Amino acid sequence: MYEGIVQDLIDELGRLPGIGPKSAQRIAFHLLAADPVDVRRLATALTEVKEKVQFCRSCFNVAQSELCRICSDPRRDPSSICVVEEPKDVVAIERTREFRGRYHVLGGAINPIGGVGPDDLHIRELVARLADGTVTELILATDPNTEGEVTASYLARQIAPMGLKVTRLASGLPMGGDLEWADEVTLGRAFEGRRVVSA
């Protein structure tokens, strides 16, 4: 244990995902030794991201205005929506340059054990987006793990009465993995080989 504010910093850093006690300590001491200008720049970036970043009113991706840059881009194909769990998944798919449609970020996956049900996700908003008839294909790009599969199956059943083409990314993604860790080639091939999902 360190004194006062040093320990407070270590404790706060340790609350971040993927940062254990040792990493938190290393980061804290790096910040203590860093140039004050660099530390102020980091503090400003943290403050600004909380003050200026919001969620897109259409797709729930991160945005600095009402619509994210993808939803406001007229070159994107409005007839195809790719459903992902988190904004980081949008970034992973965008890196492939395979998809030119729009996205819908659910904000997680169905996980009854974790207390996350369909009503806790942006599923109602997705159904509302599909109601106007513009969308012809819905691509389910949830993570290839149990929660992602449950979520994809639930969505396929909910969307089936609308008569849309519903596809799922092809295999090649490891079961139990996360989209954000897939390389561009694997994710691109999964996109190319997506399969139709039946309810």
Swiss-Prot record:
Gene that produces this protein: recR
Signal peptide: none
PANTHER family given in the database record: RECOMBINATION PROTEIN RECR
Source organism per UniProt: Frankia casuarinae (strain DSM 45818 / CECT 9043 / HFP020203 / CcI3)
MF term (GO), any: DNA binding
Gene3D superfamilies the UniProt entry points to: 3.30.60.80, 3.40.1360.10, 6.10.250.240, RecR Domain 1
Family from the record: Belongs to the RecR family.
Example GO biological process: DNA repair
Domain Toprim, chain residue ranges per copy: 79-174
UniProt-recorded name of the protein: Recombination protein RecR
Cited HAMAP family: RecR (MF_00017)
Superkingdom of origin organism: Bacteria
Entry function: May play a role in DNA repair. It seems to be involved in an RecBC-independent recombinational process of DNA repair. It may act with RecF and RecO.
Keywords attached to this entry: DNA damage, DNA recombination, DNA repair, Metal-binding, Zinc, Zinc-finger
Zinc finger (C4-type): 56-71
InterPro entries per UniProt: DNA_Rcmb_RecR, Hlx-hairpin-Hlx_DNA-bd_motif, Rcmb_RecR, Rcmb_RecR_Znf, TOPRIM_dom, TOPRIM_RecR
Coiled coil among keywords: no
Lineage of producing organism: Bacteria, Bacillati, Actinomycetota, Actinomycetes, Frankiales
